Structure formats: structure tokens, C-alpha cells
Amino acid sequence: MKRDTKQQIVQEVAEKISQAQGIYLTEFQGLTVEKMSELRGEFRKAGVEYRVVKNTLIRKALQDMAGADKLAPALKSTTAIAFGIDDPVAPAKVIKKFSKANDQLKFKMAAIDGAVYGADQLTLLSEMLSKTENIGRTAGLINNVIGSVPMVVNAVMRNMVCALDQIAKQKQ
């Protein structure tokens, strides 16, 4: 590979890293071309970019990232990097699901908003709610609160009317 090509790859990967909310390093040794294509398709469906890059080029691209030194030990063997641009946990869900059926795919490490997660924390990451799920839950909670406010106001007014009615009856 020519030096210009390597520099371009480093620049592209560094740009993706800066845009991504979460990056995931995986080992894919032993996956067939067919399985690798299937995996890329699953990532594409989830809105995740998945790319095979040489470890030395990933290391150079990570230089400006916080916590890059913690990711360095994972840069051994074959490495592919998944970029969670819009949703930091989408890659974890795909990796978890795909690795159940394919033992050759191994999760190495992830970095989300500066925090680094090891290979043993894939289950934790995959069970986290996605951004859209969190937005949906928050909207539901707000909707419930807004819906219950008129009932509370009506109950207070009803109680006040009852209290005034009782006072009026006592004075008669």
C-alpha cells in the first residue's frame, strides 16, 4: 500500500472517530467472505459503518482521541472497526447478535464518549437503550405528566368546591 493511500485511510478513520459517538473494535479472523458480507449488511441496517483497517493505521488515527492509549492493547491480530455515528450502542447490539451464531467474530474493546469498555462488557453495552428508545421513553413520561396535570387540577378544584359546600352547610 502506498504512503498516500495510508495517509488517506488514517485521515478518513480519524474523521469517522471524531464523528462517532461510539467506536467498537472486533476480531474477525476465521469469518468467511459470505459471513463477513452478512455482518456488514447487519451493520448497514443498523446505521453503523464497519471497516477493516490495519492496526498501525488505526493506532495513528486514534492519536487525537481521549483514551486512545487504553484501546492500544486491543490492536492485535485482525481488527475491524465499527463506528456508531448516530447511536453509540447500535454496534454492540449487532456484534452481540451476530457473535451468538458466529464464534469467529470477537468483540475486543469499545470507546463511548471517552469511556473504554473491555471485551467482558459487551452484554452491558448491548442491553443499553438506544438513543431513539431513550427519546421515546422520555416523550412517554412527559406525555403522562402532561395528561395527569388536568386531572390533578380538577381534583383540587373539586375538593375546594366540596369544602366550600360543607362550610356553607355548617353556616346555615
From Swiss-Prot:
Xref: NCBIfam families: PRK00099.1-1 (NF000955)
InterPro entries per the UniProt record, alphabetical: Ribosomal_uL10 (IPR001790), Ribosomal_uL10-like_sf (IPR043141), Ribosomal_uL10_bac (IPR022973), Ribosomal_uL10_bac_type (IPR047865), Ribosomal_uL10_CS_bac (IPR002363)
Pfam families with a match to the protein in the record: Ribosomal_L10 (PF00466)
Domain of life: Bacteria
GO cellular component: large ribosomal subunit
The family this protein is said to belong to: Belongs to the universal ribosomal protein uL10 family.
Subunit structure: Part of the ribosomal stalk of the 50S ribosomal subunit. The N-terminus interacts with L11 and the large rRNA to form the base of the stalk. The C-terminus forms an elongated spine to which L12 dimers bind in a sequential fashion forming a multimeric L10(L12)X complex.
Source organism of this protein record: Chlorobium chlorochromatii (strain CaD3)
Keyword RNA-binding: yes
GO molecular function terms attached to this record: large ribosomal subunit rRNA binding; structural constituent of ribosome
The protein, known as: Large ribosomal subunit protein uL10
GO BP term (any one): translation
